[in-house]
Amino acid sequence: MRTATVIAATLVLGTIVAAQQPLFKRTVVQQADLSTPGREVIQAVGEFQPGGTPGRHTHAGEEVGYILEGTLSVEQGDKPAVIFKAGQGFVIPAGQIHNATNTGTGVAKILATYIVEKGKPLATPAK
């Protein structure tokens, strides 16, 4: 009986921890002014749980992405989605509505470099 209780408690706690984990998380690792007035560079690591996505959005500048781990389906505007795997990269033009979704079964990670207008939000949800 005690073993069954411990197993049940472990399952419940595991479910709670999994439920609290966000499906997408962006962590800024570096930010600096550029020599071009009004522009800055921001580097961030995006972590996507399976099925995770930031949702359709834009940036006030270019995004250069490099897949560190996993598989992402990237949509740009009305174009068909393109699948990118670890070791591949892509460029998103300034103001382009886009989205990325982890289509794999494990965590996907991306290193994203943004060359953006200083003082503007890094990402703006698409309308």
Predicted regions and their residues:
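A short, N-terminal "cap"/entry segment at the start of jelly-roll beta-barrel domains
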Residues: 2-45, 83, 91, 107, ...
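Extracellular/periplasmic catalytic domains that process cell-envelope and extracellular macromolecules
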Residues: 36-38, 58, 66, 103-107
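Short, conserved beta-strand element in jelly-roll/cupin
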Residues: 47-48, 59-74
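Short acidic-glycine-tyrosine-enriched beta hairpin
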Residues: 48-49, 72, 78-95
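Histidine-centered catalytic micro-motifs
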Residues: 55-61, 96
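Structural recognition of the beta-strand scaffold that forms the well-ordered cores
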Residues: 56, 65-66, 75, 91-92, ...
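Ligand-binding loop in jelly-roll beta-barrel domains
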Residues: 95-119
